[in-house]
């Protein structure tokens, strides 16, 4: 049973070694993995110092500010609310809610509009073209090559990168679950292509025609080449990367409310948030149980943060499985795994180099190898 894989003797609850600016070389050579509580105490001590030192400083989307620290604290307290799969900490959920609300208020940020989301020149690559990002990573032309930038890997439009050939996209089941009234669905190419929607694409009419000929169904166009420069990596590859958008704070708030058994308020936050995504006012969240609410919330969060590195934490925190094997699936045959809870592939195996350099970690205290633990769906 693959579930047993995730709880090997002696490893459950261990995180990583703590390294600070005061850690000596000798100490680093015998530095053990610390338990979850010790690690979170360390994380919180750093964040609480940051909260104190940076108080009142607005920063920008590309440098730390008070709202960013509040956002990190909101993330941290949300995780701490889950003591185990069956034990929860309401005080931690309340703190997560409070810090999420602070981040929203201090940042002055607002959810992306449809025009900003679908912008063929600046979509998800520019910290300055919208008012959503609380924190992002700037990218400059000196640090990119045709294959050495995030855009090179993720952009299906950029002719100079891997994304042009890989065409990363949504699973069919996710795509089908997103409402046709939700403009986030336009992040992925429908099987009917331009007959379904007049996608906002970069390039000339000839380039757009060529794009439609080669693009696969469900491929993403969420992440754009900078300035729409699909043929020039020097310019098109210089895309900032979003690390924290204000939208995430609304999701943290609603999850924290639901876990405090305030479903009415949680439904209200989700309904209000979705008015920014299904703008005709037709969406209403009316989940009657926490389980039903969290299921709906996670669906909307998947549509919101696809490709941004946010969702793996939700899946692990909420003990969600993956479903890639099903009738009509568009996943490659070698990737059709189904799990009923956390997937073993999300555990990171520690490499041999760490054992050789750090005697505090031995192979016996490694995370287990997930290779071939889950059978392929057929």
Where are the regions that the model predicts?
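Acidic/polar-rich alpha-helix caps and helix-coil junctions
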Residues: 1-151, 162, 175-378
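Short, cationic low-complexity segments
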Residues: 156-172
């Amino acid at each position: 049973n693959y579930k047993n894989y995730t709880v090997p003797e002696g490893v459950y609850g261990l995180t990583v070694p703590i390294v600070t600016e005061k850690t000596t070389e000798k100490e680093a050579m015998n530095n053990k993995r610390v338990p979850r509580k010790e690690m979170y105490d360390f994380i919180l001590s750093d964040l609480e110092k940051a909260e104190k030192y940076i108080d009142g400083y607005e920063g920008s989307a590309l440098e730390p500010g008070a709202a960013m620290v509040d956002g990190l604290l909101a993330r941290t307290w949300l995780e701490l609310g889950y003591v185990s799969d069956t034990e929860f900490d309401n005080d931690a959920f309340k703190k997560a809610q409070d810090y999420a609300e602070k981040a929203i208020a201090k940042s002055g940020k607002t959810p992306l509009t449809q025009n900003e989301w679908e912008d063929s020149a600046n979509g998800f690559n520019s910290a300055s073209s919208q008012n959503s990002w609380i924190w992002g990573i700037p990218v400059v032309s000196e640090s990119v090559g045709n294959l050495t930038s995030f855009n090179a890997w993720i952009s299906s439009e950029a002719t100079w990168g891997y994304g042009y050939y890989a065409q990363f996209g949504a699973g069919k089941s996710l795509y089908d679950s997103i409402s046709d009234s939700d403009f986030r669905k336009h992040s992925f190419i429908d099987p009917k292509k331009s007959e379904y929607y007049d996608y906002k694409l970069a390039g000339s009419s000839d380039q757009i025609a060529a794009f439609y000929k080669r693009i696969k169904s469900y491929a993403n166009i969420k992440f754009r080449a900078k300035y729409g420069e699909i043929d020039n990596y020097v310019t098109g590859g210089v895309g900032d990367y979003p690390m924290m958008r204000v939208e995430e704070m609304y999701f943290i708030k609603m999850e924290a409310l639901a876990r405090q058994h305030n479903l009415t308020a949680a439904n209200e936050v989700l309904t209000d948030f979705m008015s920014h995504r299904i703008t005709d006012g037709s969406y209403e969240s009316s989940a009657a149980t926490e389980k039903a609410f969290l299921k709906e919330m996670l669906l909307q969060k998947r549509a919101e943060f696809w490709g941004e590195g946010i969702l793996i934490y939700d899946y692990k925190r909420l003990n969600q499985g993956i479903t890639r094997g099903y009738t009509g699936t568009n996943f490659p045959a070698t990737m059709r795994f189904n799990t009923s809870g956390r997937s073993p592939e999300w555990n990171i195996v520690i490499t041999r180099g760490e054992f050789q350099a750090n005697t505090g970690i031995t192979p016996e205290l490694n995370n287990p190898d997930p290779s071939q633990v889950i059978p392929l769906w057929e």
